[in-house]
Amino acid sequence: MKKNLLSLSILTLSVMGLVGCNSNNKNNSSTVEAPKYTITLSGSGENREITLQLAERFKATSEAYSGLTFDYREIGEDKVDSAVADWTTGPDVYSYASDKIIPLFAKGAMSEVPEDYLPQIEAMGPGAVGAAKFAGKTLAYPYDGGNGYFLYYNKNLLKAEDVSSIEGLLAKATTLGMKVAYELETAFYSMGLLFTFGADWQFTTNSQGAVTNITADFNSDKGIKAGKALVNIMTNPAWQNSLGAPTGKDSTVGEGESAVKTKIVACVDGTWNAAQYKQAMGDAYACTKLPTVTVDGETKNLSSFLGYKLFGVNPQTSSGDATRLSICHALANYLVGKDAQDARFDARTIVPTNREVLALDKVQKMEHIAAIGEQAQYAHAQGALPDTTWTAPTNLSAAVKNGEMTVENVGTYMANFNTAITTLK
């Protein structure tokens, strides 16, 4: 891959040098043009305009790119793995959701990120790095870190110290006669919690990208502590399995026979409900990262799932053309750079993965974006997932709800959970 970058550097120097020579020698009719390529990008319809604008800005950064033209296909990030039937005629640079990395890798649609571009990705933090990696390789460029959750709370009823730990939050809610809404019976939330003390999974793949083995350590002390945290929260009287704006006022959650009247003072939820919650709460609206939890004397910040959107580079359209592939990587790298993420935030208020952009006043003023950015350092990337990701945690939560799983027998349940997670379908 370094050779690809070198060839592009040589190409750039050659073009610039010839342009300079020709400007000083008007009688020289010999010219060398920059290579002409049509680079096809893909992503959502909403991102078409800003992506093409940024591509044109990239083109203007070097004479070596002056021969480029850009095309855009509207292919949803959640569908690109199945919507593209033939990757030899697919998009060159495409946007995708982080949980699509396994099928895209298996189809040979992912070119490894060149070493020179790794520092920019690594500076984004462990969540973004994790989302971009599979099979021991960094395969993509993260640009949107917004598909995750954090804590909304009523700042007229709770102080910052009340929401710093889950134990303190539940105790304060009990004092107020209110509830903390945390949908732990749903795997998206319970699975996120189970990473809190460091338990995780690892994949082994074959040369075709198929998963051949999954190992995990949720049956270790790290997993057992997470299991105890799940039990401690779900058995607390102030905990409630729901979502809802924490207005502190009477409200109804659920539907039909499962509907209950309640007063919610804090809620774990995602960016997608920020506008609704802010409208419902008015000046009581506040949000922050998830609180800490303490088990057996060890304190950790509650973990979460965080889904990303990334740019992948398709090697099949370059067909061995190293210069074209290098240009595609350079474009993808530019699209996740500081200036591009700043412009994308202005255009679409997309949650930046670049830490400098995330720290800007205009970004931090949007509290839900600041909160998810703060939580990102404690989040597990929703990237490559075991087949049982959405069933095994649900079964675990059900065992707690039914009174079957307790802090005394949590080791047995976490051993069974570990077996379920590592079982290939």
Question: What role is predicted for each listed range?
Answer:
Residues 4-9, 15-100, 419-425:
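Conserved N-terminal structural module of periplasmic/extracytoplasmic solute-binding proteins
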